[in-house]
Amino acid sequence: MSLMCYNKGCGQRFDLEKNSDDACTYHPGVPVFHDALKGWSCCKRRTTDFSDFLSIAGCTKGPHNQEKPAEPVKPEVKSSLDKNDVKPKYDEFIIQAPKPLESIQRPSPDEPFSILQSKISPSLKQALEKLKLTEENAHEIKEEDSDEIKIGTSCKNGGCCKTFAGQASDDETCLYHAGVPIFHEGMKYWSCCKRKTSDFNTFLSQEGCTRGKHQWKKKDAGKKVVPCRFDWHQTGSQVIISIYAKNSVPELSLVEGNSTVLKIHIIFEGEKEFEKQISLWGVIDPSKSLVNMMATKIEIVLKKAEPMSWARLDLPPVAPPKEKEKEKDVDSEDECDDDED
């Protein structure tokens, strides 16, 4: 009878009588997720794609393990205080933002746009140099681009642990997860079947919920539009917007604007794209504004046209007239006409 191996990175079934000392290739370490990179603590290979992470070959050989690891016990948190006894540490104050000065005439948002001057920091130049493909990576990409599928190639479908063993593998039914992996508050599960667990090995060994064909090659998704965390602060003469996009590509990124509108287009980490258009709260001088591109973020330094404090970064859209008030006015006019008749 075949048994399931619970070594990390294996997930294969094995015969207990044929379990030799080097039958299993696995990871003795733990999974590491940091700054969008995924890998194992026992080896140095890192990737941003979850399917590639699951297909990273083990770095240690040993016998298969049939013992399922115990799930971690969550500590029970008790409190002796009632909710009503908890008081806020600080008094609450409501601060009203200053209103824009009425004397300033706002330029038209349809003014011509100009590209803001950009400066590339030494840290970004150094980071981009490190990210250049080595000869080994270039060879791997060339192999992936070829039509030939090599023996031992892992299926790229999520949750499938099968490898290519010949033409017969194409006729097999692939059991995989059509959704995406979700890690939230210590729980791990696939969005397509919602079977939650706190143990990473149990998550990896969950059988797929969808039947289909094996996917031996990674699909080319092209550039992916993603959100970026950003914030802003101001001085007496400048507004500084910080966009936290790592390793941006200067040749493919630009920021353009006029006196009241800013258009941001950034390509970072090779294949990620961030776009945003902001209708600014105040007025700027684009000719004296600039973009500082660094390894960990991008700073857009906007020169204020007037030395005044901005209540917020963006200008709220003008609210359209309420339709209900218009309907009431029409109804009142109709009632007056009826009374005259």
Swiss-Prot record:
Q: What is the primary gene name for this protein?
A: chordc1
Q: Which organism is it from?
A: Danio rerio
Instruction: List residues of the CHORD domain.
Output: 5-64, 155-214
Residues where Zn(2+) 1 binds: C5, C10, C24, H64
Where, by residue number, does Zn(2+) 4 bind? Answer: H177, C192, C193, C209
* UniProt biased composition (Acidic residues): 330-341
* Composition-biased stretches (Basic and acidic residues): 64-81
Ranges for the region named Disordered are: 61-81, 313-341
Against PANTHER family, the record matches this protein to:
CYSTEINE AND HISTIDINE-RICH DOMAIN-CONTAINING PROTEIN 1
> Which Cys pairs does UniProt list as disulfide-bonded?
none
Protein name per Swiss-Prot or TrEMBL: Cysteine and histidine-rich domain-containing protein 1
Stored SUPFAM superfamilies: HSP20-like chaperones (SSF49764)
Q: What is this organism's lineage? A: Eukaryota, Metazoa, Chordata, Craniata, Vertebrata
Q: Which UniProt keywords apply?
A: Metal-binding, Repeat, Zinc
Biological function: Regulates centrosome duplication.
Binding sites annotated in the UniProt record for Zn(2+) 2: H27, C42, C43, C59
Query: Could you provide one GO biological process annotation from this protein's UniProt record?
Result: centrosome duplication
**For the CS domain, which residue ranges apply?**
225-314
In alphabetical order, the GO MF annotations are: zinc ion binding
The answer to whether keyword Hydrolase applies is no
A Pfam family (short name) is CS
Q: Which residues bind Zn(2+) 3?
A: C155, C160, C174, H214
